[in-house]
């Protein structure tokens, strides 16, 4: 009986510890995005468009004067081809989440949705969201949609995985979320289980560079990984994402930023 009691106490303490770590990751991400309460726009004609973001809020100065900003144009002739960057190691779990709308439609995980491992550092998955059209361009060309999967390490460093889409067959991950997106009335909707493992990469090849968050406060030092495979999404799915964006900016892609001498890699194992 004593063994069972100790086991129970150990289970409770372990659960509390894991919960506190998860809350740390979520609150760290939220603290970087709390300034979204300050209005900004994707339309330059409003005076609050992307070119003016750095002047709207003192905490957003990097949006205007940063030297490692995102997104960028990935130009084939400028890429450094590498076979040693390493496989992107994913370990995702289904977890409870909240579907939210604002400047974009997003899924914010409340439970432990798993992590990725980049160069020996673990980054917890906290959120994903969509931009229309794609934010990153490829030799100057944009795609119809881009998904960003946002991860945070224990020391508050960020890593984002980007996946671009062209029109074609429906995307399986969006198909599972589609009923919730279509019925999203208020600012958010609880979803019992969302499995980030349903997001398909389709290729081990990827682009890599150091950039920033692509929305205010445009925090720099973000590790960007853009999957090489172009996935497909249906027109109906993209239309649903655009219709539910709260502020009416159906095109919510920041213009590409200057490279400022940064290296861009292409991992080809």
Tell me what each language-model feature is.
Residues 2-269:
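Alpha-carbonic anhydrase
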């Amino acid at each position: 009986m004593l063994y069972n009691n100790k086991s129970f106490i150990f289970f409770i303490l372990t659960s509390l510890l894991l919960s506190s770590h998860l809350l740390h990751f979520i609150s760290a991400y939220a603290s970087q995005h709390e300034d979204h309460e300050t209005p900004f726009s994707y339309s330059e004609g409003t005076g609050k468009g992307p070119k003016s973001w750095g002047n709207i809020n003192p905490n957003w100065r990097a949006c205007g004067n940063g030297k490692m900003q995102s997104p960028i144009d990935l130009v084939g002739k400028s890429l450094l081809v590498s076979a040693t960057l390493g496989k992107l190691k994913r370990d995702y779990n289904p977890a409870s989440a909240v579907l939210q709308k604002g400047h974009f439609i997003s899924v914010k995980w409340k439970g432990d949705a798993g992590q990725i491992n980049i160069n020996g550092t673990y980054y917890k998955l906290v959120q994903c969201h969509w931009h229309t059209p794609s934010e990153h361009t490829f030799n100057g060309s944009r795609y119809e949609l881009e998904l960003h999967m946002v991860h945070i390490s224990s020391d508050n460093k960020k890593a984002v995985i980007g996946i671009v889409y062209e029109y074609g067959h429906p995307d399986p991950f969006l198909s599972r979320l589609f009923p919730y997106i279509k019925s999203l009335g208020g600012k958010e909707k609880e979803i019992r289980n969302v499995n980030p493992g349903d997001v398909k990469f389709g290729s081990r090849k990827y682009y890599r560079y150091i950039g920033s968050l692509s929305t205010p406060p445009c925090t720099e030092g973000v590790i960007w990984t853009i999957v090489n495979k172009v996935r497909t999404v249906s027109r109906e799915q993209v239309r649903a994402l655009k219709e539910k964006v709260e502020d009416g900016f159906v095109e919510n892609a920041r213009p590409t930023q200057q490279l400022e001498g940064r290296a861009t890699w292409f991992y080809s194992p």
